[in-house]
From Swiss-Prot:
InterPro entries named among the record's database cross-references: SCRL
Disulfide bond entries: C32-C92, C42-C70, C68-C88
Gene Ontology BP, a term: signal transduction
Entry protein name: Putative defensin-like protein 225
Source organism superkingdom: Eukaryota
Length: 92
């Protein structure tokens, strides 16, 4: 009985260690990020438009994998259009 419990605990510890290594490697892949506001709303075709808008910026990486998220920001003044804020992660 003691050996069975010891085996189960050691398997659990190894699982935790191995899963942490995978998270560190994933963070290394998309380690850099940038945030930029754009006019308009996010829309339905969000991901493709965000990535293309970000790649048009001179400071954005051109030939790298990029992941973007978009959120709408309401306008602060009446009559002014709202904007969308894109936060993108890319490989350094």
């Amino acid at each position: 009985m003691k050996y069975g419990v010891l085996f189960m605990v050691s398997c659990g510890v190894m699982f935790l260690i191995l899963s942490h290594v995978e998270e560190v490697e994933a963070m290394k892949k998309f380690g850099c990020n940038t945030t930029h506001p754009f006019p308009g709303k996010c829309g339905n075709n969000g991901k493709s438009s965000w990535v293309s808008d970000m790649k048009k910026l001179p400071s954005a990486p051109k030939n790298r994998d990029i992941r973007c998220e978009c959120s709408d920001r309401p306008s602060l003044a009446r009559g002014m259009p709202g904007e969308r804020v894109c936060r993108c992660d890319y490989d350094c």
